[in-house]
Swiss-Prot record:
It comes from Methanocaldococcus jannaschii (strain ATCC 43067 / DSM 2661 / JAL-1 / JCM 10045 / NBRC 100440) (Methanococcus jannaschii). This is Uncharacterized protein MJ1240. It comes from the Archaea. The lineage of its organism: Archaea, Methanobacteriati, Methanobacteriota, Methanomada group, Methanococci.
Amino acid sequence: MEIKKSYKDYKKLVWNVSTEFTQALARIMFFYIVNDLETAKNLAKITSPYLPKVPSKLLKELSEAIEEEIKAKSDIEKEKAKEKVKKAFVKLFYYTV
């Protein structure tokens, strides 16, 4: 029960827009990993306008890939979408290095 409350408290805090790219990426990754795809997608979408051109474009790509995963109906569609999400995360990691 305590974990659920902590999660809800954290989820409220993340909507304070971060213009720090690595912090925003960590937030998005967290929600993606815990399978809260809607929050991960929305964080990527709302953060992208506050960042420079390249990371903004990469976050939009990630947001679109997560949206595809959310909307996927079949297992094949879901796997293809997950592959796009992985590629988008890899691009974001390469950008940060």
